[in-house]
């Protein structure tokens, strides 16, 4: 049984996590993480590994300079939704282990917000699964974003397009 840590509830049990390949990780972080160190720590010996690191943009949706991005999530449900998405895509693309780290809280422009990595026997499977996992994560995981420009915070109604 895998245990996940998130910023509000100290430990969340996600049963579907047991169905992902051993070594897969899905975590919500309230503090900064170094994506390159996390990738090194995750490591593996698969023939292919595709990864994506997303950072907070420097401008808001209205084009103004962004001071911060605030992210909220639904603890427990968020991890379950991401795990279900990862499991389905891992099967669809015949991929191996997956790594999904996502930040919550208040982030400054340039800070890493998400890391998605996928291993597979072939680069095509790893790349397709990684891209699909990122898109599903952006549109189906219960995260809420609030942009801070100056002293004004604005909740976003949707995610940016590809």
Regions picked out by a protein language model, each given a short descriptive name:
Residues 12-113, 119-162:
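N-terminal, polar/charged subdomain of small-to-medium soluble alpha/beta proteins
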